[in-house]
């Protein structure tokens, strides 16, 4: 059955016959966190390839196959990982969404938004914690989920698909999310453009130095362990230069 659903006829059949379990969801979408499907849900059935939404992603940020599969298939998980990417190793940050998904039974954006804040903070603090500061990050993640629900109908990918934004508009939308300053927003835009198939007009210009091809300066440039090492070396050089400038 799974093989049939990934053929053109199977995809058409799925779109025509599967009814969603809630009227606010369009046809054919399953929960985020299932490899190869989009961040929606329907009443049973199989997932549709993420490429149907114009994205082709095989990320290698967490350096863990299952955690990276979640990031590749779930735009919301990728957003959460980016939020966590500060003051800890980036691999640990991008492994965070999988930890949360394992503990609450998936990373459905509605479920995260509606979770009891105290309980969600406790879950995020369980060892191994999702972050050095799990309590504050738990709140930020729930705030992010609520914005995705309120502004984008629970579809994190609508951040870059709704209204066909150009690079400048998409950067503006990203900066409006909790935890995204100018630089982090540009890095995320660079990641979307370089690895997530989000080639909106002007994305490289809006992403600044993080949109330049052939660089190894941010998360946007990490595709394997080797490039992770190059990015880490670059950041070490930046810190050393900053320290020398203060001396």
Language-model regions, residue ranges each:
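Basic polycationic patches enriched in arginine
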Residues: 2, 15, 40-41, 53
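Short, positively charged and aromatic/hydrophobic N-terminal segments
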Residues: 6, 14, 25, 46, ...
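Intrinsic disorder/low-complexity segments enriched in small, polar and charged residues
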Residues: 7-11, 18, 28-29, 85
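Cysteine-centered motifs
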Residues: 20, 37-38, 42
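C-terminal accessory module of base-excision DNA glycosylases/AP lyases that mediates lesion recognition
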Residues: 21, 49-68, 73, 167-172, ...
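Structural motif
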Residues: 66-77, 87-89, 131-136
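Short, aromatic/basic-rich helix-turn unit that serves as a nucleic-acid recognition element
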Residues: 79-83
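Alpha-helical ds-nucleic-acid-binding substructure associated with the helix-hairpin-helix region
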Residues: 103-175
């Amino acid at each position: 059955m799974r093989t049939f659903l990934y053929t053109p006829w199977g995809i058409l059949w799925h779109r025509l016959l599967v009814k969603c379990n809630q009227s606010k969801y369009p046809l054919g979408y399953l929960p985020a966190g299932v490899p190869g499907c989009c961040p929606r849900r329907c009443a049973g059935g199989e997932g549709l390839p993420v490429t149907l939404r114009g994205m082709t992603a095989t990320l290698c940020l967490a350096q863990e196959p299952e955690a990276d599969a979640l990031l590749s298939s779930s735009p919301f998980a990728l957003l959460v990982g980016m939020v966590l990417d500060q003051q800890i190793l980036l691999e640990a940050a991008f492994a965070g969404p999988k930890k949360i998904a394992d503990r609450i039974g998936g990373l459905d954006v509605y479920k995260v938004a509606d979770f009891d804040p105290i309980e969600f903070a406790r879950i995020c603090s369980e060892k191994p914690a999702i972050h050095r500061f799990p309590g504050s990050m738990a709140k930020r993640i729930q705030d992010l989920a609520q914005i995705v629900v309120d502004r984008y109908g629970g579809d994190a990918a609508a951040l870059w698909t709704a209204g066909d934004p150009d690079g400048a508009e998409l950067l503006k939308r990203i900066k409006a999310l909790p935890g995204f300053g100018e630089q982090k927003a540009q890095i995320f835009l660079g990641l979307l453009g370089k690895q997530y198939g989000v080639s909106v007009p002007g994305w490289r210009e809006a992403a600044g130095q993080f949109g330049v091809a052939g660089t190894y300066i941010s998360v946007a440039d990490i595709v394997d362990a080797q490039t992770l090492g190059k990015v880490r070396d670059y950041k070490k050089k930046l810190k050393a230069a900053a320290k020398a400038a203060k001396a």
